[in-house]
Amino acid sequence: MKKIGLASDHAGFELKEYVKTWLKAKNYPFEDFGTYSTDSCDYPDFAHPLALAVEAGECYPGIAICGSGEGISMTLNKHQGIRAALCWMPEIAHLARQHNDANVLVMPGRFIDNEMADKIMNEFFSTDFDTCEVNFTL
């Protein structure tokens, strides 16, 4: 398995630290692109390096967290090769992987707890892209 890339801003830092514990327990390698504290910061400073690493194939998938998840999602999705999906419940994570081939999971740090993050990550990591979604003709 490739390294999983992680990024957050200050509002997502605590959940990101929990995600690191979750990944370690499952023996998933990861790279943390920051932030490294709860000090106020700008999410693009950490979203762009994560997006570049996923685009380059250095990390797959990515996990990004900010307060609402919206800002970091918008920044990530400015990158051509990124399909970041904001997921606040497992069903959305499932559909994001199955139908949209999401390569970055985004979670809202201010609106979900660790238990919900567990469920979302389990669903995201256990769902494959359904390739029939791309096998159609117009």
Q: Predicted regions: what is each one?
A:
Residues 5-7, 11-12, 90-138:
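C-terminal binding/interaction regions
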Residues 3-4, 59-62, 81-83:
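Short active-site oxyanion
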Residues 29-40:
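A short beta-strand-loop structural module common to alpha/beta enzyme folds
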Residues 64-110:
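Mid-chain, well-packed structural core segment of small domains
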Residues 46-64, 68:
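Short, structured active-site "lid" loops
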Residues 6-25:
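Glycine-rich phosphate/diphosphate-binding loop of Rossmann-like nucleotide-binding domains
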